[in-house]
Amino acid sequence: VEPGVTFGELRPALAKEGLAPLMPLLPPRGKSVLTAFHERTPITAPRFHWEPQDPLQCVEVVYGTGDIMRTGSAAIPSSLEAQWQLGKAQVRGTGPSQVDFTRLLQGAQGTMGIVTWGSITCRPLPKRSKLFLVSCDNPTPLVELAYAITFKKLGEDLLLLNRASLAAMLGTTAQEIDELRIKLPPWILVLGIDAAGVLPEEKIAYQEAECTELAQALGLALRAAAAGIGAQRIEAMLSGPTPETDWKLRRRGAGASIFFLTTLDKACGFIDTFRAIAADRLDPFGDIGVYVQPTVQGANCHVQFDIGYSPASRCETQDATWMVEEGAALLA
């Protein structure tokens, strides 16, 4: 993948090869694939996430000295085209030797070099897919279900949202978002099961049965809709980038975010802490979007709080700034 290629451009190109990209949650329409994965933006399918670097593997980087370096499997003295002619595939990120130079470039705070291309892990294009919604009044049972699902390596897409986040993703106007926030349950776990290869129907059937059993043990249920919102609508939404305005900006016009990595068992505690911070300001916690994304096979997770505000309101801007600064200090 070269710089500037977006997810909207990558998806149809991969589909012709029987593949699909590992998607972050609703990336902006103009977001570069390479930029997203250099920033370690989490993907929504933790089963394909084996280490924090994934799905980025090899890169070619030009350093400030003019030196060109290729990392991982590509670290041999020949061009990319010459490697393809030899049957080489750029599938391993570590290298040369045992040093992971790709990881040095990820999350860099400043310019270390210019990346001219990168190789990424993809997933087989599903022949069948089915998405389920699991709702609850509090996130704790849903976190326990996410643990159980990732432990058994079931499903593909798996993420936890509160109603403020899901409404912002589904709605296109402030009025529609507000109406959805009233209708939707407080917390929703999104579970997608895909099937590629042979016997796709059977694969979906046995995974659905196992996930249903896990949910019932926690007093939960897998459903095809939540508050009249069909799972197919959410599945279509998750399959690509944000069509127009970034979903975090739709309701108020501007937004600020706090995000960090932790483990799933601590996620609910951080949510409670941020709820207490929000109670000290005018903005109620219900107006704050929460997104919990299991990563690295469920070994840890990405937790994100999204605070919307009107850029025309000095008071709202100050409140959002205060909540980000105070929240970052208390959650650190």
Q: In which residue ranges do the predicted regions lie?
A:
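Generic recognition of long tandem-repeat/solenoid scaffolds
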Residues: 1-2, 258
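C-terminal substrate-recognition/cap domain of FAD-linked oxidoreductases
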Residues: 120, 130-327, 332
